[in-house]
Amino acid sequence: MIQGGDPKSRDAKPGQMLGDGELGYTIPAEFVTGLYHKKGALAAARQGDQVNPQKASSSYQFYIVQGNTWTADRLKMVEDRYGKKFTPEQAEVYATLGGTPFLDGDYTVFGEVVEGLEVVDKIAAVPCGPMDRPIEDVKMKMTVIER
């Protein structure tokens, strides 16, 4: 998984801690059928359930799912442990493409990488320092395609 969006990151010094930039508001959780945490999903980060039981999304931080492939047995374990139910389509995608199914229904997915999944893997593989920040900054540029 790769994460970005902190407004402080544009001018951050090497090694500076990121992730606590504020815009002063959150966005209500929105769980849409058909949008789930398959590899390449674009989702909103958020604070944990202890301080955010409404699962409201960050107004600025996002992540892109990388994830591994999942066998039927492992998906069944996720269903049992987290009380989730996956459609046959989701099970097929998680088995072939991969993702992070245990996050479904807990974090808002609002888009996906439609081209360049190999870039997600390359970004996820860069050497990182403390707090999982890349030693050399990786700048991401995104284009929004509306359907």
Where on the chain are the PLM-derived regions?
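Cyclophilin-like peptidyl-prolyl cis-trans isomerases
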Residues: M1-R147
